[in-house]
């Protein structure tokens, strides 16, 4: 009987750990994605999507709208960057970001910011 109660206690503890760790991972992902969206909005950069230029606020609104429609499928911040924030779902073309005459893909730009964010919030 004692062995059974110890096993039951162990199962309960493991279940609690899984529940808590899943919630923490979800909160971290949400915090990270919200930070990236705010990072886009507050930048002084020009966002180039399918050859047309947009302001930082327009870029954030566009990416946030895409994310809202499929957020239940996005499990990580990296997936958010690669599938939502870095390329057109219609043309497949990469989004570009132009900051102070330097142009790069939004995937590179946001991946770097995600690394910076994580290093500040460990």
Tell where the protein language model's regions lie, with residue ranges.
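Bacterial N-terminal signal peptides
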Residues: 10-20
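N-terminal secretory signal peptides
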Residues: 26-66
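Compact alpha-helical subdomains of small soluble proteins
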Residues: 51-122
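Bacterial N-terminal signal peptides that target proteins for export
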Residues: 1-12
């Amino acid at each position: 009987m004692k062995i059974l109660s110890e096993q039951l206690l162990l199962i309960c503890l493991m279940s609690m750990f899984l529940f808590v760790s899943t919630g923490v991972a979800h909160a971290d992902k949400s915090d990270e994605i919200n930070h990236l969206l705010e990072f886009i909005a507050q930048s002084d950069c020009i966002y180039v999507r399918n050859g047309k230029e947009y302001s930082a606020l327009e870029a954030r609104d566009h990416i946030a709208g895409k994310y809202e429609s499929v957020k239940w499928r996005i499990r990580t911040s990296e997936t958010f960057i690669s599938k939502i924030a870095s390329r057109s779902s219609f043309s497949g073309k990469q989004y570009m970001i132009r900051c102070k005459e330097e142009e790069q893909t939004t995937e590179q730009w946001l991946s770097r910011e995600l690394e910076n964010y994580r290093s500040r919030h460990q």
